[in-house]
Regions:
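N-terminal catalytic or cofactor-binding beta/alpha core of small enzyme domains
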Residues: 2-170, 175-294
């Protein structure tokens, strides 16, 4: 069942509200959306859903980064359908969610700030004039306005679980294009993971049991790639149970498609998250030390 408007609460956490106001006020104006959205904050599940590329919004001060409007509707600006799926899944499994408030073209919330791909000047054939030759102060301005508040909101939610004595699970929601360049991507959904198999492996098994689904194991992207900042920073480094989901965008273009995938994934996750033994710190995370390159 799709979530109602009553379930949505958009807010800033105490941490983000206490951040120095200067840079953010200079970039974000009164008509701009907040840097993150908190959805279904009263969810009772010991899990947090995050969505890094939920929005195509660009601060008015950045003048759409010099792009035509139609370019901001492309996948280079956001993960199409991911926000709606994250909200529907949040309602389906009764877990809070934090969604990024700005386009990945402003600053990519799933990248470290020092990563060159955090501020993309050219992507999938599209030049982004407003990202060309960015100075370090300009990058810091965007980070302070959009990247840092989002990650502080996630950290605050996870800390609240810990204050209650819980080890929370983290579920990251993304979407991907059916074709990228000349590569045709046959998967309906991908399950991304690195060392911790506790959610990913049973989720793969449950999704593969669904008739007609092509399910990718670390496809079309790999959870072992070091660029997946949000999961690495908030979950993997802390030993929290976690998984990243990638659903093909053409599956998420209609309300019925969103509802179908929220039901499919939600049903599988509900069984997995019902296991109390899941909610412990993953001790094997130290196995990364001395390993080969990812």
């Amino acid at each position: 069942m799709p979530p109602t408007d009553a379930a949505r609460v958009t807010t800033r956490t105490a941490e983000s509200a206490e951040a120095p106001p200067g840079p953010r006020e200079r970039l974000l104006g009164a008509g701009d959306p907040p840097p993150f959205e908190t959805f279904h904050p009263a969810g009772r599940r010991r899990a947090l859903i995050v969505c890094d590329h939920a929005s195509r919004a660009i601060p008015a001060a950045l003048d759409r980064l010099g792009l035509p409007d139609e370019a901001t509707w492309r996948h280079i600006a956001w993960d199409i359908g991911a926000a709606e799926l994250a909200r529907a899944l949040s309602a389906r499994i009764d877990a809070p969610a934090v969604l990024a408030g700005y386009s990945r073209l402003v600053v990519d919330c799933n990248r470290r700030l020092e990563d060159p791909n955090c501020f993309v000047a050219f992507g999938d054939g599209q030049r982004v004039p407003g990202n060309e030759n960015l100075s370090d102060p300009e990058k810091r301005l965007r980070a302070a306005a959009c990247h840092e508040p989002y990650h502080k909101a996630i950290a605050a939610r996870l800390q609240e679980f810990r204050r209650q004595g819980a080890v929370p699970a983290v579920i990251s929601v993304h979407s991907f294009t059916p074709v990228l360049g000349t590569e045709v991507r046959p998967w309906n959904v991908g399950v991304l993971w690195d060392h911790d198999p506790r959610i990913a492996v049973p989720l793969l098994a449950r999704l593969r049991a669904e008739p007609g689904l092509v399910v990718g194991d670390n496809q079309p992207y790999s959870g072992r790639h070091p660029a997946d900042y949000t999961v690495d920073h908030h979950a993997e480094s802390a030993g929290l149970p976690h998984v990243c989901l990638e659903v093909r965008q053409d599956e998420l273009l209609t309300p019925s498609g969103i509802a179908r995938w929220a039901e499919l994934i939600g049903r599988a996750l509900t069984d997995i998250l019902a296991d109390d033994s899941l909610y412990t710190v993953w001790q094997a995370r130290e196995s990364r030390a001395g390993g080969g390159s990812r």
